[in-house]
Amino acid sequence: MGDPKRPKKKYVEGKPKRLWNSDLLMSELRLIGEYGLRNKKELWLARALLRSIKHRAREILSAPMEIRGEAEKRLKDRLFRMGLISDINIPLDSVLALDVTAVLERRLQTLVYRKGMARSIHEARQLIVHGHISINGVRVRSPGYLVPRNLEDGIGFAPTSRIVKAKVTQQVNQGGQAVNQ
């Protein structure tokens, strides 16, 4: 009996009810390929996060008006800081329309690829895991890190990374100025 061997999974009820549904399998496979996910567990974690956000939004919509105003403002502010919504003044019903791609677009792996720091989504994952990527000077080694909106501009190569040194050396050899990214 005693303590459990491992903590509880974070994607409680994140697994689909019917694992062998061909439409679901194809959509999951497309998302895994498009966002460079390592396994379906990463997709289920994103779905679980989105499910909890939508659940909170439904609770707020069903709450009385005196409670609803402040709770709605807090939820929208949190989602805006996370980067999942583009404007705080959107109706709460549009929060219910969010899909899993909104969460997957905020992953560090996706943002590194979208910024052009990697040639492919898989290379972006490798750069992160090997410690070549930092956010505001702090190395982040988790490709699944959800980057808040205020830290998005701080994504860059780690200053001590060999990739930065190689690029600076290459620029100097070509006669250009050494520019630190």
Swiss-Prot record:
<keyword id="KW-0694">RNA-binding</keyword>
<protein>
    <recommendedName>
        <fullName>Small ribosomal subunit protein uS4</fullName>
    </recommendedName>
</protein>
<dbReference type="InterPro" id="IPR001912">
    <property type="entry name" value="Ribosomal_uS4_N"/>
</dbReference>
<keyword id="KW-0689">Ribosomal protein</keyword>
<dbReference type="InterPro" id="IPR036986">
    <property type="entry name" value="S4_RNA-bd_sf"/>
</dbReference>
<dbReference type="InterPro" id="IPR022801">
    <property type="entry name" value="Ribosomal_uS4"/>
</dbReference>
<dbReference type="GO" id="GO:0015935">
    <property type="term" value="C:small ribosomal subunit"/>
</dbReference>
<dbReference type="GO" id="GO:0006412">
    <property type="term" value="P:translation"/>
</dbReference>
<dbReference type="InterPro" id="IPR005710">
    <property type="entry name" value="Ribosomal_uS4_euk/arc"/>
</dbReference>
<dbReference type="InterPro" id="IPR002942">
    <property type="entry name" value="S4_RNA-bd"/>
</dbReference>
<dbReference type="InterPro" id="IPR022802">
    <property type="entry name" value="Ribosomal_uS4_arc"/>
</dbReference>
<dbReference type="GO" id="GO:0042274">
    <property type="term" value="P:ribosomal small subunit biogenesis"/>
</dbReference>
<dbReference type="GO" id="GO:0003735">
    <property type="term" value="F:structural constituent of ribosome"/>
</dbReference>
<keyword id="KW-0699">rRNA-binding</keyword>
<feature type="domain" description="S4 RNA-binding">
    <location>
        <begin position="106"/>
        <end position="168"/>
    </location>
</feature>
<keyword id="KW-0687">Ribonucleoprotein</keyword>
<dbReference type="GO" id="GO:0019843">
    <property type="term" value="F:rRNA binding"/>
</dbReference>
<comment type="function">
    <text>With S5 and S12 plays an important role in translational accuracy.</text>
</comment>
<comment type="similarity">
    <text>Belongs to the universal ribosomal protein uS4 family.</text>
</comment>
<dbReference type="InterPro" id="IPR018079">
    <property type="entry name" value="Ribosomal_uS4_CS"/>
</dbReference>
<dbReference type="Pfam" id="PF01479">
    <property type="entry name" value="S4"/>
</dbReference>
<comment type="function">
    <text>One of the primary rRNA binding proteins, it binds directly to 16S rRNA where it nucleates assembly of the body of the 30S subunit.</text>
</comment>
<comment type="subunit">
    <text>Part of the 30S ribosomal subunit. Contacts protein S5. The interaction surface between S4 and S5 is involved in control of translational fidelity.</text>
</comment>
